[in-house]
From Swiss-Prot:
Function: Plays a crucial role in virion assembly and budding. Expressed late in the virus life cycle, it acts as an inhibitor of viral transcription and RNA synthesis by interacting with the viral polymerase L. Presumably recruits the NP encapsidated genome to cellular membranes at budding sites via direct interaction with NP. Plays critical roles in the final steps of viral release by interacting with host TSG101, a member of the vacuolar protein-sorting pathway and using other cellular host proteins involved in vesicle formation pathway.
Motif (PTAP/PSAP motif): 88-91
Pfam family, one: zf-P11
Modification after translation: Myristoylation is required for the role of RING finger protein Z in assembly and budding.
Name of the protein in its database record: RING finger protein Z
InterPro entries: RING_finger_Z_arenaviridae (IPR024183), Z_RING-type_Znf_sf (IPR038485), Z_RING_Znf (IPR003224)
GO cellular component: host cell perinuclear region of cytoplasm; host cell plasma membrane; membrane; virion component
Membrane topology note: Lipid-anchor
Domain notes: Late-budding domains (L domains) are short sequence motifs essential for viral particle budding. They recruit proteins of the host ESCRT machinery (Endosomal Sorting Complex Required for Transport) or ESCRT-associated proteins.
Positions where lipid (N-myristoyl glycine) attaches: G2
Zn-finger (RING-type) residues: 38-74
């Protein structure tokens, strides 16, 4: 779900990846100074998105996008297109 592109996008881009997409990370590794957290709320540490030099959770990203197209922390343009780095897995189908 969500990993395939529509026919219109395939016709436009072919096999190459559409530009401007940023990866969303489900599990962040430990850094030298501890866990990665959302720079806005400081609570979320899963499902983080990279915004220039810091990370944001989906909730804070949505709230910031409602106000403006620019990040309230760093002033850069907020990311709008997402790509999952690890595709979700499902158990094998057994008939």
């Amino acid at each position: 779900m969500g990993l395939r592109y529509s026919k219109d996008v395939k016709d436009r881009y072919g096999d190459r990846e559409p530009e401007g997409r940023i990866p969303i990370t489900l599990n962040m590794p430990q850094s030298l100074y501890g866990r990665y957290n959302c720079k806005s709320c400081w609570f979320a540490n899963k499902g983080l998105l990279k915004c220039s030099n810091h990370y944001l959770c989906l909730k804070c990203l949505t709230l910031m996008l409602r106000r403006s197209d620019y990040c309230g922390i760093c002033g850069e343009v907020l990311p709008k297109k997402l790509v999952f780095e690890n595709s979700p897995s499902a158990p094998p189908y057994e008939a």
